[in-house]
Swiss-Prot record:
GO cellular component assignments: cytosolic small ribosomal subunit
Function: One of the primary rRNA binding proteins, it binds specifically to the 5'-end of 16S ribosomal RNA.
Gene3D superfamilies found in the cross-reference section: Nucleic acid-binding proteins
Keyword rRNA-binding: yes
Lineage: Bacteria, Pseudomonadati, Pseudomonadota, Gammaproteobacteria, Candidatus Palibaumannia
Keywords assigned by UniProt, alphabetized: Ribonucleoprotein, Ribosomal protein, RNA-binding, rRNA-binding
A Pfam family per the record: Ribosomal_S17
Keyword Cytoplasm included in the entry's annotation: no
Stated family: Belongs to the universal ribosomal protein uS17 family.
Gene Ontology biological process: translation
One of the record's GO molecular function terms: structural constituent of ribosome
Protein name, per record: Small ribosomal subunit protein uS17
Length: 89
């Protein structure tokens, strides 16, 4: 065996927090824009991802950055990296 670190392609995404009611968990809505294959109109599509928030630092409306990690639970395989922008409440 060689002592070489093999890094896989780590995915990083940005999104808004839509729920923080669970302990150490958040739900993040990630928006993307796609072009309709026939009509050519640009459409917004939203994906909701469950992520791990170790310190319960996020609030609803925060813009955050998450990265993919090993599965933490049945639905969580993303972890919070940083809070980009706090929500104005």
């Amino acid at each position: 065996m060689y002592n070489v670190d093999i890094k896989k392609n780590i995915r990083i995404k940005q999104g808004r927090v839509v729920s923080n009611k669970m302990d150490k968990s958040i739900v993040v809505a990630i928006e993307r824009i796609i072009k309709h294959p026939i009509y050519g109109k640009y459409i917004k599509r939203t994906t909701k991802i469950h992520a791990h928030d170790e310190n319960n630092a996020c609030n609803i409306g925060d813009l955050i950055e998450i990265k993919e990690c090993r599965p933490i639970s049945k639905t969580k395989s993303w972890i919070l990296i940083r809070i980009i922008e706090k929500a104005i409440c």
